[in-house]
Amino acid sequence: QKSFRAEDIEEVGDNRHTTFFEMLGNWSLGDYFKKEQLRWFFEFLTEEVGLSPEHLYVTVFIGDEKAGVLKDTESAQIWKQLFKEKGVDAKEVEIGSESDGYIKGMQDGRIFFYDDKKNWWNRGKPSLKTTPIGDPAGPDSEVFYDFRTPHNKAFGKECHPNCDCGRFM
């Protein structure tokens, strides 16, 4: 879908933000769920587009005990299986916040658990706190491509999939 975003206009010009782009979305209300959706997306990236699975890294929601929202272990297990089918080991790493990522780093991981600022979808600014009651919202999963460029420590001590150094998109 064609997307124009102005909510993060102040970030345009960094390694990841533009105002207009085409976004691949995969939405369903009851027709299919994580198992099918994640497989279709992985197959699209690796078989149709031809991306090497060794260059792909994924993020999932870490959960929020206070809000009563569980860690998305289901998506992590699906991703683990998909990578295994391609011969790629998929270690899980709990990051938490983006700032935690600059301390914890990659740790040889492939599947990373982030908080609601990174892996929670809603119609507004991503966060459990900004989600209006009754609105469609929930944990999401994102895929990052590793360009294998050296980490620029000006962005933080350690690199991680949500790092802005340019290694991942």
Feature-to-residue mapping (PLM):
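Structured aminoacyl-transfer and RNA-binding surfaces used for tRNA recognition/handling
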Residues: Q1-M169
